[in-house]
C-alpha cells in the first residue's frame, strides 16, 4: 500500500508555511517586474515551481538529516527517520520533483536557467552547512531568494534597483525568521552539534533579529517613497510593522513554542506586504 500520508508529511504539504515563505518574495518580484499585472502563465509557472522546489528541498533535507532528526524532539517522527518512507522511495520522489521543476524551467528564458542551477546546488548544500558553518541561515537566504531574479528575468526586466532592494529585503527576512525557527530547536542542536544563527548569535539573538527586521522593513519604505505610492501602501506597511513587533514580543522570553509561533507569524507579514505591493502598483 502506498504511504500517501507519509509522502505528504515528507513534502511538508501538511505544513504549507514553507511554501508560502518561498512564494511571497517571488510574488513580490512578479508584481514589481510587471507593474502589478503579471500574466497568468507566469503566475502558474512560478507557483508550481515554488511548490515543487520547496518539496524537493524538504526531501533533500530529510535525506541528509535522517540520522540527526531522531535526536531532535520536533523531528524524530519524520517519515524517513521513522521508517515510514524508505531511502529509495525518497530518492525516487526527489527525482520526480526535480524533473517537474525542469519541465517548468524550460518554459522560461535561458538566463533563468543559471539562477535555477544555483538554487538547486545551494538547496543540496544547505543541509550539510548545518554541520560545519556557524550561520547556515545565510545559505538558506540565498536559496530562498533565487526566485526573485528569475521572476525579473522571466518578465523581461533587467536586475535593476527594485531587484536589489527586494533581494536585500528577502535575504534579511529569511535570516530573521529562520533564526526564530532555529531558536525552537536550540537546546537539541547544542547537544548534537548542529549549528545555527540561534546558537551563533548567542545572547544577541533577539537584538540581531530586531535589527534585521527594522532594516528590511525600512527598505520597503525607501522603495515606496522612491515610487511615490499611494497612502494605502503605508497603511499596510504599518500593519506589517505591527506583525514584526508581535514577533519580537513572542521571542522575548526565548520559549521554544513561542519562537516557533513567531516563525509561523512570518507568513502573515509576507501576505500583508504582497497586498501592499499590489496596491502600490495599481
UniProtKB/Swiss-Prot annotation:
UniProt xrefs under Gene3D superfamilies: UbiA prenyltransferase
UniProt topology in membrane: Multi-pass membrane protein
GO MF annotation: an example: 4-hydroxybenzoate polyprenyltransferase activity
GO cellular component annotations of the record: plasma membrane
Highest taxon in the source lineage: Bacteria
Catalytic activity field: all-trans-octaprenyl diphosphate + 4-hydroxybenzoate = 4-hydroxy-3-(all-trans-octaprenyl)benzoate + diphosphate
Subcellular location: Cell inner membrane
Function of the molecule: Catalyzes the prenylation of para-hydroxybenzoate (PHB) with an all-trans polyprenyl group. Mediates the second step in the final reaction sequence of ubiquinone-8 (UQ-8) biosynthesis, which is the condensation of the polyisoprenoid side chain with PHB, generating the first membrane-bound Q intermediate 3-octaprenyl-4-hydroxybenzoate.
HAMAP family registered for this protein in UniProt: UbiA
Protein name stated in the entry: 4-hydroxybenzoate octaprenyltransferase
